[in-house]
């Protein structure tokens, strides 16, 4: 089931429905004209960055609400930065991960070990868990990890084998290497800029290569896939593909844009990039 829909976009804005709530938020890349001007009147609230960060109509919204996005029930809430606790451009990736994990687990006759880095509110973690994977969810924000745990409970996955880790990603990976822990599949969505649990500075242009080198070292000898996403300007699909290919070598490589999508009468909105490495029968990288 899916309760998300992109209703329209244009004039630097996007209009989206999340379950029972419709929101009008900034979207710098939507430089075209709106396709359906009348539908914008449906917005329950409006977020602007023109004079600081401000929600208009926020008082009309519930403090939080539940919406199912591509089979994952998510708790949503308007944050002071205009976020909600889900990035719907990743929902196609959730579907791919759920299906790939299911197929790989059946083929191996054992659960895949799935690692989600910079894991936010856990949509991908829960999609992997729905596919039967044993998961490890890592984020530097204690609040976001707690939010993800609440989402797990909403999906009847509170007792599923998921390790919830609040930590700096690179420090966590270094410790996992020393402990000898290995993972069959890894997803990472590094921020452009962030701080770790202990205040460690993370700038993607300086830190990502180190992160990927550490990821390579925690991969099992029977890897399934590595999935890399980014919302950083300049980190195009080819940039991400080159990074993965250089480190992981032979395998099936794909890349593209993450998109917000609605009906056929609305424009798809580019909202980030992705690259993916999958093991192939000819690959002997590991």
Locations of regions flagged by a protein language model:
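Non-catalytic substrate-recognition/targeting regions of SAM-dependent transferases
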Residues: 2-19, 23-88, 95
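Conserved alpha-helix/loop element of class I SAM-dependent methyltransferases that forms part
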Residues: 88-108
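Conserved class I S-adenosyl-L-methionine
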Residues: 110-120
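Short beta->alpha hinge that forms the Motif I/post-I loop of the SAM-binding pocket
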Residues: 119, 139-143, 207
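Conserved SAM-binding loop of SAM-dependent methyltransferases across substrates and taxa
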Residues: 121-135
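S-adenosyl-L-methionine
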Residues: 141-187
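S-adenosylmethionine
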Residues: 169-249
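C-terminal catalytic and target-recognition region of SAM-dependent MTase-like enzymes
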Residues: 223-286
